[in-house]
């Protein structure tokens, strides 16, 4: 029945690679082929069927192995192809560059040959030199001598395909390729040598030319500069040639080293490749062993299945003639018996080891006892020795010196540590301050960044809304254009009216200047006529502060009449006060906006009424007859002077108050102007028109009030002035006043025309407003939205400015912190200098310490001398110990011989017991010749094995997981309950969870 298995085993050798066949055949000769059990067979058909099944199974295994081998071979083929491709590529590259090198060398040789032919024609035959040293020139590079050794397939031109070179390499053998490459190498060497010879020849020729030039220069009169230049060039040429030769030598040496390193690299690569091949071989062997292991595992699994199914025993003698058991069963029995024997042997060995361990522990204890006794010697014995006393004295001296040195060292270390700690504390304090400031700066910067991000978001939202509003406003573009055109026309008309008003203002200023001149002339006339001048001064100076302040002038006190002042001083003060009154009135008229001029004109009218009343009251008092007495006139002059001074001070106060009011009104006008700018354009135009109208009306009212005042003044002055010169001047003033009145009439007519035009334009504007009401409403809404957006944008810009200012402040703070850090760094440098000084002092202390250590070494030498005496005593002790050691080996040898004899005795006893068991088995086999009896005996043995060794009645159904010995569950539980918790065989302790029930089928 073992025929198919023999065929399979013989065929297994062909599945491996060819290089492994010999070793595989050698290995297969040593393997044992087990017989194949087919079981009970009733007919030949059943036998053929089982044989075919077995063959199919083996073929399937072989097929799997073959597929695995094919996969591995494919991988190796791919690797080899890749390697071959890389090798071909490198060969092609080497061939191409080698061919290029040969071509360049040939070109250089041609150039040198052509130059040599041209130069050799004029030269003498004696000066020519051959290319070689022996006079036999090498053939030309184009001749056949250099090209014959090289075949054309190894030196293809660049135009030929690279495949020809690879095909030629594949067609030729290794010896041919080596010969061809050697010839090509010789050609390259010869060409390079010729190039070198040509370069040497050129160099020699250059040297000859230089010598000729030098000799010719010596014979012919040349300039010293040319000679020096030629010598310098010659030296430079020689230096460059030497440098070139040195560089060539260096390059040659480096190239040789590089080639050596390349050879080493290639050798290392070859070693790596060899190692890879060995690794692949080992992997192949491992794979083969793995496959063999798989086969054995399959066989073992089949055997276990057959054992579990009870297929391995046949109860009748029909299957096997003579009732014999199978070979595997016999092996199994033998293995079990050997296992039992080995277990017993291991137990005996374990007992021996435990015994030896106990003996070793006893020996260690006995060895430790004298050591402990030596360690625990009484102190009195040690103190009584002379060596101890001598060492104690030396130790006391050395100890005192070491204490002194130690105190000094501790002091130095303490000082150093104190300085270091103070330095570190200062640095930590500085670092903590710096960290705190950095944290504050970071938090402030983060807050500013957050606010900036919020402002940017708001700005983006406003911009988006503004763009939306612009897009909405573009729809009403044509209507807005028409309205703007109409408004621009009205604005142009208003600008014309404003220009006329400005022109009238200038005329009014000129009139006021002329009136001031007249007042000055009138005051001059009062100086010439003293009896009439005082009433004029009082009449001129009194209304000025009344006009500015809007109330009656202050009444002079009785004490003021006693003081005297010159008359010209009073006139000058009155004229200066009037000029100051005129200047702020003009500035107020120019500075006020159109919206604020209406109330100011009303205030002026209200101020003009009390002025008139004051003048009417003062008129009788200031116009006394010229026949008054001189005393009363002098008192009156004093009172006038004092009153003029007081009025000047009050006038200054009033001017300051008016300046404050003007500033406040200017702020209000700025606010109104901002509101006016942010208001819609139609409202702005309407406000401009109304403001211009109010302004014109206010100017007209002011001019009328001034004309009335001037008329009243003229009337009072006509009563006061009696002199002819004054009358003449008054007439001139009246003529000017009439002229101004005529101008005023013309301005009134122009004003009425302007007012009528304003009414017409206002009516047209109202009509247009009624027509475009709805559109204006929409525009107002859009303008309101734009106004809101603009206000929000202004707020955002203000916030942005504030944030920028805060950022600048933070930058200044950062600069301050940097300056603080620099100052702290300076302090750190100072501390480091102090530390260096302390380190220098520490170095001095260390020097002292070295001196002390030298003294300590002297004392140590003394101690060594004392130790030598002790060693002499030790030598005597060692003599005694050597005798003891000589005796101890004899004792150890005798003990070892005795132990060896006991060990051999035990081994002999074990061998005797093992041989006895074999003898008993052999006797059993001889006694029970019949197979049935053998089977019955084996069954009894198996039953005895399956019974519990403790009670010998129940079957084994419990296992101890500590040692895996099997007993019956009742015995194990009884021992556990009786607290005998150790294995009956090996005395291994077990617990409640260490025994389990098993079921043997």
Swiss-Prot record:
Alphabetical GO biological process terms: chromatin organization; positive regulation of transcription by RNA polymerase II; protein ubiquitination
Which molecular function term from Gene Ontology is one that the record holds? protein homodimerization activity
Tell me which residues bear N6-acetyllysine. Answer: 20, 355, 517
Q: Which Gene3D superfamilies match?
A: Zinc/RING finger domain, C3HC4 (zinc finger) (3.30.40.10)
Give me the ranges of the annotated region Disordered: 1-39, 116-153, 519-646
| PTM annotation (Phosphoserine): residues | 42, 528, 585
Position(s) of the covalent cross-link Glycyl lysine isopeptide (Lys-Gly) (interchain with G-Cter in SUMO2)? Answer: 578-579
Give, as residue ranges, the zinc fingers classified RING-type.
Answer: 948-987
Q: What is its EC number?
A: 2.3.2.27
Q: Which residues form a coiled coil?
A: 44-91, 189-369, 437-518, 627-946
Tell me the domain of life.
Eukaryota
Question: Where does this protein have compositionally biased stretches of type Basic and acidic residues?
Answer: 18-28, 602-619, 633-646
Query: Per its UniProt record, what Pfam families does this chain match?
Result: zf-C3HC4 (PF00097)
Recite the UniProt keywords alphabetically: Acetylation, Chromatin regulator, Coiled coil, Isopeptide bond, Metal-binding, Nucleus, Phosphoprotein, Transferase, Ubl conjugation, Ubl conjugation pathway, Zinc, Zinc-finger
Question: One cellular component GO annotation, for this chain's record?
Answer: HULC complex
Q: Where in the cell is it found?
A: Nucleus
Q: In which pathway does it act?
A: Protein modification; protein ubiquitination
Q: How does it assemble?
A: Component of the RNF20/40 complex (also known as BRE1 complex) probably composed of 2 copies of RNF20/BRE1A and 2 copies of RNF40/BRE1B. Interacts with UBE2E1/UBCH6. Interacts with RB1 and WAC.
Protein family (similarity comment): Belongs to the BRE1 family.
Q: Which PANTHER family match?
A: E3 UBIQUITIN-PROTEIN LIGASE BRE1B (PTHR23163:SF4), RING FINGER PROTEIN-RELATED (PTHR23163)
* Function, as annotated: Component of the RNF20/40 E3 ubiquitin-protein ligase complex that mediates monoubiquitination of 'Lys-120' of histone H2B (H2BK120ub1). H2BK120ub1 gives a specific tag for epigenetic transcriptional activation and is also prerequisite for histone H3 'Lys-4' and 'Lys-79' methylation (H3K4me and H3K79me, respectively). It thereby plays a central role in histone code and gene regulation. The RNF20/40 complex forms a H2B ubiquitin ligase complex in cooperation with the E2 enzyme UBE2A or UBE2B; reports about the cooperation with UBE2E1/UBCH are contradictory.
Which protein is depicted? E3 ubiquitin-protein ligase BRE1B
Q: Which organism is it from?
A: Pongo abelii (Sumatran orangutan)
- Tell me the gene name: RNF40
